[in-house]
């Protein structure tokens, strides 16, 4: 792939300890847990396993850094932005290493890991520009008063990161949190802690003061739950399943009513009308379903195709799926890697079995690929109905469900008939049809004649059980600030 430096196979593991107060340290218990390569299920290394006592230490480090009068609290906003720019530059310097490390940790193709890192750098630079622009305002109130607002940092934030985009999701949360002046504990997914720990070393190198960013690897049921329920953490940002997100919100409410932002599950529809360019729509729907091995909250797993082109679409979709290059993620032409672990592999295979049992037609795939790792063949089903369980629940795997529809009103109702509302897409050359569809969709993002494009400048998030609030763009700054109103009585107001 042009412009991408070659990967490093089996990159050196430079950091496997907990990062607190700008130091890599052993966990309090001195326990470690294994991290595996999902391509072959071979152990990569052992990482120090954080527990509640390590979270407490990280919280105290955050509180010390956030104390009034500290270098972090007194730092000029322009200087804070400079540190974020510096962190982006360091990531750019080490981009090939970080992409290689992420590929080993997740199994995703190296070229995709590389693009993830490019996007991380863009996000850091975007929010670096916001550091000295997230300002309050003066308000012209009645009477002899001077009224204005301040946008102040929330304080100590807990960032709970998923395994599907480890560095990308960390950056989506960390960059705006830092731009607003917060301190944070990052808890990466237990399966994929390595790039987060390496990023911690770059945070120190960039010049962020001790305690501002702390990274504690560990298990969700221990560290994640404790962050959600911790009395001294002011905000939690979580990306993961709706089921776990509800537990996070319960813990947040029962503890100190901490603020929550949630990016949760999805079951996104992609609608193809008969007037579109068919090969292009097939390609876009293919990538929507299989990108990142289907391990995306915004995966376009429900493909609705107009009845006039349905059979031909299915035929071409099967051709695309069967030709998708599956295998070694370090090869530049590989498009499809393994699922993250055995648990997820088994869940996907069970969904496939249930789909066949309910009468959906398996057109290709549906089996394990190879005899090592957790590879699932790109899988296509036709003759799927909305009532089937795998049409309603998030599979989080490489399974494309192709359904037939007759007209606009019908497909709008079917698209919206779900518990989720992450994203949707329409492929059509009719501008009036596209406007009707985009306005009717009950979801956070609608793509027209494209799929899976998001930008640092634009908000991303879901309706309904797909989440709360937005990440990226100016909208996410609200999630990491408190608005304070200040009112002075003055001798005389003048215009």
Curated annotation (Swiss-Prot):
The keyword DNA damage does not apply. Omega-crystallins are structural components of squids and octopi eye lens. Contains relatively little if any DHAL activity. GO terms for molecular function: oxidoreductase activity, acting on the aldehyde or oxo group of donors, NAD or NADP as acceptor; structural constituent of eye lens. Keywords: Eye lens protein. It holds the Pfam family Aldedh. Lens. This is Omega-crystallin. The keyword Hydrolase does not apply. It comes from Nototodarus sloanii (Wellington flying squid). The lineage of its organism: Eukaryota, Metazoa, Spiralia, Lophotrochozoa, Mollusca. Belongs to the aldehyde dehydrogenase family. InterPro entries: Ald_DH/histidinol_DH (IPR016161), Ald_DH_C (IPR016163), Ald_DH_N (IPR016162), Aldehyde_DH_dom (IPR015590). PANTHER family: ALDEHYDE DEHYDROGENASE-RELATED.
